[in-house]
Amino acid sequence: MTKALFFDIDGTLVSFETHRIPSSTIEALEAAHAKGLKIFIATGRPKAIINNLSELQDRNLIDGYITMNGAYCFVGEEVIYKSAIPQEEVKAMAAFCEKKGVPCIFVEEHNISVCQPNDMVKKIFYDFLHVNVIPTVSFEEATSKEVIQMTPFITEEEEKEIRPSIPTCEVGRWFPAFADI
């Protein structure tokens, strides 16, 4: 029987205060891995912005990833599961965000882009999460590709407004300024 441990990144493995993995956590994961336990990352982050696990990756402690809230899962270079958002729903979200004048992050299998970035994108993704700068693209360019996750910077009221146009999508919030879809 295979035994596995699953860990979130932000606030679980990586401290919100230090933006690092505590040495005691690294030692515990090394001990678990040495006993044959598999270690998986389970996160809302897309692969393109997992930039804070090098201390574990350098030690080959991570056996696989469940990213984008389960929409993209992989072990090494092998994709185990991928669930793209239907193109008509991606276009509906893009049109909604463009009309409202709010940013939206679009995540593909290997790339990430943002449309209409503002100070909130900078504050949350660059300053708080220490994500590298995300390329800015037009809504037309963002919707021309296969999208696995969208992060619109919309209120809960706006979420209710767009919800009928994205019926196959699951919506999650961990911060009031945006939703992971």
Regions found by a protein language model. Name each.
Residues M1-F7, E30, A34:
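Non-catalytic pre-domain segments flanking phosphatase-related domains
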Residues M1-A4, P22, I181:
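Mg2+-dependent phosphoryl-transfer enzymes with acidic/Ser/Thr/Gly-rich catalytic loops
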